[in-house]
């Protein structure tokens, strides 16, 4: 249906558009982790899905501690929602890690990237030429690899990302500026 409408260059119509946007927001909330998707399909319960995603995030934290006993990688990871919320042009490492050497920061970012839990987007001065020759290793943004985990990480300070928050996000009724959720 979507292909036919797209190929014919006709609008979806309000009803189909609303459903597609709701499905997209549902994907942003649940994410694509197989355990979270499976839990949502089985229970249709956001609390249980949130518990699954928190377990995954806890496993990530355990792995980060194995890589970096100082906890700096965990701090960089946990600060991703706050950094994206700032709407800055780059991740400001100095606001997360004080007195950290640039070479140490590059090493931490490389470890985080190698963990496959984040995507690093580097600033490039001239993207038309080869990206690797123009990327600025000191100017970057970090994004979580799974949008559902990002949603849970955003509300990590609460014991449970309440069903009411999920429902409001799903129905576009949450008053906060959550553009950074879409950016991730």
Q: Where do the language-model regions lie?
A:
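Conserved small helical "lid"/interfacial subdomain of P-loop NTPases
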Residues: 1-5
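Amphipathic alpha-helical "lid/sensor" segments that cap RecA-like P-loop NTPase cores
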Residues: 6-58
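Accessory nucleic acid-recognition modules appended to NTPase machines
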Residues: 38-184
